[in-house]
């Protein structure tokens, strides 16, 4: 599990693409501390397993499903990526519950400044937007953010300068694709609720008597 608090911005060192998968090598520093092969690191919000460790980088496999569902396929050598190690049991819960399993992608429709705040408007599919609520949490490229406004075709978040400086948001432009993970709590609640309103029971004592019971 992750929290959406980015520890550092890494750089894509290499991408070895196969027919249905890829191997990413990411230059990093902070997230390498204490990391072992088999540990999890979120790369732009996607939980990846470390397969190799180097003095200045790590390598991870990316499966076909992840490539299809995320914006990782848009990465090139030199791309800046947000990195976060899995939260330890005694770690500080600074953001919100982030599984590292992205729901899909969004596209930056607009970026504007409002005094010190920087607003990002993201357009996405209705299947994702149904879980986006005003003042709720959402993960954009691994960053835990609060939804400031919801529209029929997307939503907006308002970020502080510190967040922009400490993440790859300062390198994002209008038209860029980003990974989105909605709040997992909402998805679990939907799954547990009945799929439809139970039908009213029309069986009565009079009906039973008419039928000979």
Model-derived regions: residue spans:
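Conserved loop->alpha-helix
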Residues: 1-213
